[in-house]
Amino acid sequence: MSKIRILVGVKRTLDYMLKPRINATKTAVDLSGQKMSINPFCDIAVEEAIRMKETLKNRIEDTLVVTAGQTSSEPILRQCLAKGIGRAALINVGEKELEPLSVAKLLKATVEKEKSNLVLLGKQAIDDDAHQTGGMLAAMLGWPQFTSASKVRIEGDKVIVTREIDGGEETLSSTLPAIITTDLRLNVPRFANLAKVMKARKAPLGKMSPEDLGVTIDQRLQTVSVSEPVQKRQNIMVKSVDEMVKTLKELGAL
């Protein structure tokens, strides 16, 4: 049986408990002063990598978590280290806007550099819901891809993944190397204790740039506008039945 080198891709997003607000120019979500966290789907991927490390033990040669962004993304990397990931690295892209294709290119170069043979990714990010990075990375590497995994098993060099589909479940298998994108049903991420959090604050982080990886970042898409969902329900208070009937007629409901 071959050794397993796991790479987990993660993304920094607006905390899922917060309601997004649109900036003044209506071209993006305003992140100024907002709490940022690890994308929940990425957190599932991190947890699964740690569980593999715990259960497969000597077979896991390396666990590496990678994110592409600015130095402001370092806290989520340290969070992953505190939970049990072995190493963490930041691909510093500065102020550049990243599209899924650029992220896939950066991950491909990192996979090849680190000789990873199992990649875990969240199936989507809650900010753009693109669902694209995993598929693009699989195509670039020529690896099999398991999407929206709700159960994962590794038996020898075989990866067995169950995913939920309409009205049931589908189980697929392939051999390493492979890419898995994770669904929220796969596991429940752990919390790191204070001692591990403090230790992770002092842990070294790998630093790379797109140039180090031989990747050129091109922006092919331009955001034209961003808007909040249209309010479909109106709350109208009435004082009597007659007023209610009148209001319903005015709205065309009667």
UniProtKB/Swiss-Prot annotation:
Where in the cell does this protein reside?
Mitochondrion matrix
Q: How is the cofactor bound?
A: Binds 1 FAD per dimer.
Q: Which GO terms describe its biological process?
A: fatty acid beta-oxidation using acyl-CoA dehydrogenase
Listed cofactors: FAD; AMP
Coiled-coil parts of chain:
none
Q: Say where the protein is mainly found.
A: mitochondrion
Keywords, alphabetical? Electron transport, FAD, Flavoprotein, Mitochondrion, Transport
| CDD domains cross-referenced by the UniProt entry | ETF_beta (cd01714)
What's one GO MF term for it? electron transfer activity
Report the InterPro entries cross-referenced here: ET-Flavoprotein_bsu_CS, ETF_a/b_N, ETF_b, ETF_beta_N, Rossmann-like_a/b/a_fold
Cellular component aspect of the GO annotation:
mitochondrial matrix; mitochondrion
Family named by the database record: Belongs to the ETF beta-subunit/FixA family.
Q: How does it assemble?
A: Heterodimer of an alpha and a beta subunit.
Question: What's its job?
Answer: The electron transfer flavoprotein serves as a specific electron acceptor for several dehydrogenases, including five acyl-CoA dehydrogenases, glutaryl-CoA and sarcosine dehydrogenase. It transfers the electrons to the main mitochondrial respiratory chain via ETF-ubiquinone oxidoreductase (ETF dehydrogenase).
- Protein name as it appears in the record: Probable electron transfer flavoprotein subunit beta
Q: What is the native source organism of this protein?
A: Schizosaccharomyces pombe (strain 972 / ATCC 24843)
